[in-house]
Amino acid sequence: MQHERMNRPLIIRTLGRTDYLATWQAMQAYTQSRDEHSHDELWLTEHAPIYTLGLNRKGVRLPSRHDIPLIEVDRGGKITYHGPGQVVIYVLLDLKRRGMSVRSLVSAMEDSMIALLAEHGVTAAARADAPGVYVEGAKIASLGLRLKHQRSYHGLALNIDMDLAPFLAIDPCGYQGLQVTQVRDLGIALTSEAAAQKLLDKLTTQLGYTDRLTENTL
């Protein structure tokens, strides 16, 4: 029975642009309803402009602009921005069933993005003091997770081809003056759609899945 559960296909949901609040609530509901037979899932999406404030709120500078909504959420970390042209992948895994630590999951997420950039000649790295992926000190991807009963939700956001100006109104991830960058500005000619598929392939491999199914709805 344990072998059967470990080899259930990974479900990849390609959702297009979604409402942040509705997607967050769907993640919570799925995680709450999970049992030992539930599939692990990756949700690929993109959001309309929104700031999200994680659970680590001490000393956070709130956005200096008010034309973009701000929502308080239950992931780790501080404040970040989501918007069109950014690849978002939510990671809904049963870590206990997979024998995976949170640190291993974070590393898999970071390593998949680092490998994607390396394919295009860009050297990127993670930082122990600030989860995410960086290119020459500028942040190109953010991470944030929540665990309930060793089941994860939330995930990663990789900047592809977006308006970076909203990041100027915050201290990304709580770091004053932290620069941000994106795939387009590094001279990589990848659409969000192409980058998303490449990243899904790499993340699936990093997580150790060999069988996956794709669906387009929640």
Swiss-Prot record:
Record domain BPL/LPL catalytic: where: 36-211
Disulfide bridges in this chain: none
Compartment(s): Cytoplasm
PROSITE patterns: BPL_LPL_CATALYTIC, LIPB
Keywords: Acyltransferase, Cytoplasm, Transferase
Pathway terms, separated by semicolons: Protein modification; protein lipoylation via endogenous pathway; protein N(6)-(lipoyl)lysine from octanoyl-[acyl-carrier-protein]: step 1/2
MF term (GO), any: lipoyl(octanoyl) transferase activity
Keyword flag Cell inner membrane: no
EC supergroup of this enzyme: transferase
Catalytic activities: octanoyl-[ACP] + L-lysyl-[protein] = N(6)-octanoyl-L-lysyl-[protein] + holo-[ACP] + H(+)
Site (Lowers pKa of active site Cys): K139
Cellular component terms (Gene Ontology): cytoplasm
Location (main, coarse): cytoplasm
Gene Ontology biological-process entries: protein modification process
Residues given in the record as substrate binding sites: R75, G76, G77, K78, I79, T80, Y81, H82, S142, L143, G144, G155, L156, A157
Coiled-coil ranges per UniProt: none
Record-annotated active site: C173 (acyl-thioester intermediate)
Pfam family, any one: LplA-B_cat
EC number: 2.3.1.181
Task performed by this protein: Catalyzes the transfer of endogenously produced octanoic acid from octanoyl-acyl-carrier-protein onto the lipoyl domains of lipoate-dependent enzymes. Lipoyl-ACP can also act as a substrate although octanoyl-ACP is likely to be the physiological substrate.
Additional remarks: In the reaction, the free carboxyl group of octanoic acid is attached via an amide linkage to the epsilon-amino group of a specific lysine residue of lipoyl domains of lipoate-dependent enzymes.
PANTHER family attached to this UniProt entry: LIPOYLTRANSFERASE 2, MITOCHONDRIAL-RELATED (PTHR10993:SF7), OCTANOYLTRANSFERASE (PTHR10993)
Family designation: Belongs to the LipB family.
The protein, known as: Octanoyltransferase
Organism: Methylobacillus flagellatus (strain ATCC 51484 / DSM 6875 / VKM B-1610 / KT)
